[in-house]
Swiss-Prot record:
Keywords: Aromatic hydrocarbons catabolism, Detoxification, Dioxygenase, Iron, Metal-binding, Oxidoreductase, Repeat. Its EC number is 1.13.11.2. It holds the Pfam family Glyoxalase. Belongs to the extradiol ring-cleavage dioxygenase family. Involved in the meta cleavage of catechol to 2-hydroxymuconic semialdehyde. Essential for growth and viability in the presence of catechol and probably involved in the detoxification of catechol. Induction: Strongly induced by catechol, less strongly by 2-methylhydroquinone (2-MHQ) but only weakly by chromanon (6-brom-2-vinyl-chroman-4-on). One of its GO terms (biological process) is response to toxic substance. This is Catechol-2,3-dioxygenase. It catalyses: catechol + O2 = (2Z,4E)-2-hydroxy-6-oxohexa-2,4-dienoate + H(+). Fe cation binds at H213, E264. PROSITE patterns: EXTRADIOL_DIOXYGENAS, VOC. It comes from the Bacteria. The keyword Repeat applies.
């Protein structure tokens, strides 16, 4: 198998929501994004004023489905540069009265919440890569224990911010899929991501580029053979994967076409439908 380039990373996610005004209040005031560009029905959000991290598109008639009922978004994950910034974000969430879940995953500390349309969000900070451990099979050792909430808040101290730091990125995307075997074939054999977590006991598979703990999480927690998200539902429409140069874009596109998947190409991007989550992936440089 040919691995995807080590400098590959997630770009942004595009979501359908029901009310742009309500969502902007949440994503800007609570999460800390800034509006980069806005029309009547769509907004592009950023942390640094330059790079798009999230696109919201309004569909007032969009249906909000019960959790874990279809394939598609489990959560998109906002990666903060350090533990202090995660603590500052936590304090902001608490001040706004947001319901928060949390998990210490050994490689990272994470907070979990949902937007007004039920789209899952993770806000997290990585621990130093030198501390990440792998088991005998090469899987990263990832746990789910309680985050030291008091310690996070102590890290933040009295510092409060209304916006995300400039070097915030989308660290990973986690998807409900219909079949893990097919997901493995598509994401590893076709796209070229490396398996970094084959967690059969928890019905999940984590893949990445360049040794990261995961750029894409895949699970069957909505049920094996779960149906795809209807087109009239809120949720993830597509996400982007950023490749370092045109040569890599051509290599990945050729692998996808050779495997029999249809793609939509432009001069410096292509789009393919993920057969197991129903979301589209746009590869860009």
């Amino acid at each position: 198998m040919t691995s995807i380039h080590e400098d590959t990373h997630i770009g942004y996610a595009k979501l359908t929501i029901r009310s742009l005004e309500r969502s902007l209040q949440f994503y800007c005031n609570v999460i800390g994004f800034q509006v980069l560009k806005k029309t009547d029905r769509q907004a592009e959000l950023t942390a640094d004023g330059k790079r798009v991290l999230l696109i919201l598109e309004e569909n007032p008639s969009a249906v909000v489905l019960p959790e874990r009922s279809v394939t598609g978004l489990y959560h998109f994950a906002i990666l903060l540069p350090d533990r202090k910034e995660l603590g500052i974000a936590l304090a902001r969430l608490i001040e706004h009265g947001i319901a928060i879940g949390h998990g210490d995953h050994a490689v990272s500390e994470a907070l979990y919440l949902s937007d007004p349309d039920g789209n899952g969000i993770e806000m997290y900070a990585d621990r130093p890569r030198s501390t990440w451990q792998r088991d005998r099979e090469g899987n990263y050792v990832m746990t789910t224990t309680a985050v030291d909430i008091e310690g996070l808040l102590e890290e933040a101290g009295d510092e409060r911010k209304t916006s995300l730091p400039n070097d915030t990125i989308i660290g990973h995307i986690h998807l409900h899929v219909s079949d893990l075997k097919e997901a493995k074939a598509f994401y590893t054999d076709v796209l070229g991501f490396d398996i970094v977590g084959n967690y059969a006991g928890m019905s999940a598979l984590f893949v990445s580029a360049g040794g990261y703990h995961h750029h894409i999480g895949l699970n069957i927690w909505a049920g094996r053979n779960a149906p795809p998200k209807p087109t009239n539902a809120s949720g993830l429409d597509y996400y982007t994967v950023v490749l370092p140069h045109q040569e890599e874009l051509d290599l990945v596109a050729n692998r996808v076409k050779h495997a029999g998947y249809s793609i939509e190409e432009t001069e410096n991007s292509f789009r393919v439908k993920d057969p197991v989550s129903g979301a589209y992936i746009t590869f860009v440089i």
